[in-house]
UniProtKB/Swiss-Prot annotation:
It comes from Mycobacterium leprae (strain TN). Belongs to the KAE1 / TsaD family. Required for the formation of a threonylcarbamoyl group on adenosine at position 37 (t(6)A37) in tRNAs that read codons beginning with adenine. Is involved in the transfer of the threonylcarbamoyl moiety of threonylcarbamoyl-AMP (TC-AMP) to the N6 group of A37, together with TsaE and TsaB. TsaD likely plays a direct catalytic role in this reaction. It catalyses: L-threonylcarbamoyladenylate + adenosine(37) in tRNA = N(6)-L-threonylcarbamoyladenosine(37) in tRNA + AMP + H(+). The keyword Glycoprotein does not apply. GO terms for cellular component: cytoplasm. This is tRNA N6-adenosine threonylcarbamoyltransferase. It holds the Pfam family TsaD. Fe cation binds at residues 124, 128, 313. InterPro entries: ATPase_NBD (IPR043129), Gcp-like_dom (IPR000905), KAE1/TsaD (IPR017861), Peptidase_M22_CS (IPR017860), TsaD (IPR022450). Its main location: cytoplasm.
C-alpha cells in the first residue's frame, strides 16, 4: 500500500506509558471512518519478568532503544517512504510511568516539529476505549468497563469525541494488579494475567469460593475493591498448603469476573444504554469474556470486546483516539505541554 492511495488524514501515534513501545499509523477519512495502516509493538516484558514486575528505569531505557526502529518499521508498513509524512502526530501524554511517558512524548514532539504537523497529546485510557473501532466499527453510546494492570473504571461514553463520565473505579488495587499479585503468590511469575488464566481453565471454579468485594448492600454500586480478595487468596493458600493451584486460580478468576461483569451489566441497564464495551489488558481474560457474553445476552445488551491484540497497550489505539478527537474538531496540543503520569480518565487530551 502506498500513502498516495490512502485518502484522508494520516495519524502517527506513539504509546510508551508502561513496558510496551507502540507505534500505530491510522487514516481518518472524510466520513469519520478510521482505518489501521500499521501497528508495531516492541515489549520489554521479558526483561521485566526477571524482577517480578515493571521496573520503571528498565522500561524507560527499553523505550529509548526500541522507539526509533519501531517508528521506522511502522512508517515502512504504512507506505510512508521517501518524502511522505503523516498529517498529524499523537502520543500518550498520561497516565503512566513518568520516565516512560517522557520518551514517547519527546519523540512525538520532535517529529511534529520536524515535519511541521500538529501534535495531539492524548489520554492512554481513551486509547483503550477507541481500540475496538478497528474490529467493530463506530462506537455507539455505551457503558465501558476499562480493566488493566493499573486501572479499573466504569465509564459512560456518549461518543469517543465527547466528554467521558466516570461512574466508578477501584478504591484500592486494580483488577490486573490483583492478577499479577495472585500469580506471584502461586509461583507463576510475571506477567500473571495469561498464565493464571491458562491455569484456571484446568481447575474447578466452584471448588473454592472467594469473597466478592464491594458487593454489600451499603457499598457503592459502581465501585470496585480487589485488595481484600488478594488477601483472602493469600490466607487460603497459607492455611491450605495442599490446595490445587488450578482450583485457587479458577476460584480467584471467577470472583474477579463475577464482580466486574455484574457491576458493568447493572450500570448499562440502569442507564438505559444498549451496549457494554469491555477494554484493557484484563479484557483478554477468557472467563471475563465468557461470563460477560452470558450476562449481556441475558440482559439484552450488545457486548463489544476487542480481540486480545487490541486489549494490550499499542500505538494503534492511540491513533484511533486521536482520530476521533480530530473528527470532533479538537484543537492540537502545544509542543510545551508536559506529560502527566496521573492524568485522570475523564481528561481526554491536554491542549
Amino acid at each position: 500500500m502506498t500513502i498516495s492511495a490512502v485518502p484522508g488524514t494520516i495519524i502517527l501515534a506513539i504509546e510508551t506509558s508502561c513496558d510496551e513501545t507502540g507505534v500505530g499509523i491510522a487514516c481518518l477519512d472524510d466520513y469519520g471512518t478510521v482505518t489501521l495502516l500499521a501497528d508495531e509493538v516492541a515489549s520489554s516484558v521479558d526483561e521485566q519478568a526477571r524482577f517480578g514486575g515493571v521496573v520503571p528505569e528498565i522500561a524507560s531505557r527499553a523505550h529509548l532503544e526500541a522507539l526509533g526502529p519501531t517508528i521506522r518499521c511502522a512508517l515502512a508498513a504504512a507506505g510512508l517512504t521517501g518524502s511522505a509524512k503523516p498529517d498529524v502526530v499523537a502520543a500518550t501524554i498520561g497516565p503512566g510511568l513518568a520516565g516512560a511517558l517522557l520518551v514517547g512524548v519527546a519523540a512525538a514532539k520532535a517529529y511534529s516539529a520536524a515535519w511541521g504537523v500538529p501534535f495531539y497529546a492524548v489520554n492512554h485510557l481513551g486509547g483503550h476505549l477507541a481500540a475496538d473501532v478497528y474490529e467493530h466499527g463506530p462506537l455507539p453510546e455505551c457503558v465501558a468497563l476499562l480493566v488493566s494492570g493499573g486501572h479499573t473504571h466504569l465509564l459512560q461514553v456518549r461518543s469517543l469525541g465527547a466528554p467521558i463520565v466516570e461512574l466508578g473505579s477501584t478504591v484500592d488495587d486494580a483488577a490486573g494488579e490483583a492478577y499479577d499479585k495472585v500469580a506471584r503468590l502461586l509461583g507463576l511469575g510475571y506477567p500473571g494475567g495469561k498464565v493464571l488464566d491458562d491455569l484456571a481453565r484446568t481447575g474447578d471454579r466452584d471448588a473454592i469460593v472467594f469473597p466478592r468485594g464491594m458487593t454489600g448492600p451499603a457499598d457503592d454500586l459502581n465501585a470496585f475493591s480487589f485488595s481484600g480478595l488478594k488477601t483472602a487468596v493469600a490466607r487460603y493458600v497459607e492455611s491450605h498448603p495442599d490446595a490445587l493451584p488450578a482450583d485457587v486460580a479458577a476460584g480467584f478468576q471467577e470472583a474477579v469476573a463475577d464482580v466486574l461483569t455484574m457491576k458493568a451489566v447493572r450500570a448499562a441497564t440502569g442507564l438505559g444504554v444498549s451496549t457494554l464495551l469491555i477494554v484493557g489488558g484484563v479484557a483478554a481474560n477468557s472467563r471475563l469474556r465468557e461470563l460477560a457474553a452470558q450476562r449481556c445476552a441475558a440482559a439484552g445488551l450488545m457486548l463489544r470486546i476487542p480481540g486480545p491484540r487490541f486489549c494490550t497497550d499499542n500505538g494503534a489505539m492511540i491513533a484511533a483516539f486521536a482520530a476521533h478527537l480530530l473528527a470532533a474538531a479538537a484543537p492540537p496540543s502545544p509542543l510545551d505541554v508536559p506529560s502527566d503520569p496521573g492524568l485522570p480518565v475523564v481528561k481526554r487530551q491536554i491542549n
